Swiss-Prot record:
Name this polypeptide is given: Exodeoxyribonuclease 7 small subunit
Species for this entry: Thermoanaerobacter sp. (strain X514)
EC number: 3.1.11.6
MF term (GO), any: exodeoxyribonuclease VII activity
UniProt keyword Hydrolase, yes or no: yes
Location in the cell: Cytoplasm
One CC-aspect GO term: cytosol
Length: 75
């Protein structure tokens, strides 16, 4: 896929893949290709989640530093 999908679009695609594989009516090669695509999507989703988690942690830490500095001013 050349175009970058949103997180939600990739989640929907992963759900489609899982549902299709669970039906069990595909040929072995088709199942393997879908499984491979699902693993690739899963890795991208995990990477995106990790990046967002890092940003959230950074924001929380920055906010704590600001709060701490404001408390020092009050003393």
């Amino acid at each position: 896929m050349n175009e970058e999908l949103t997180f939600e679009e990739e989640m929907m695609r992963l759900e489609e893949i899982v549902n299709t594989l669970e039906k069990g009516n595909l040929m072995l090669e088709e199942s393997f290709n879908l499984f491979k695509e699902g693993v690739e999507i899963s890795k991208r989703l995990e990477k995106r989640l990790s990046e967002v988690e890092g940003k959230i942690t950074l924001l929380i830490n920055e906010n704590e530093e600001i709060d701490f500095k404001e408390e020092e001013k009050d003393v």
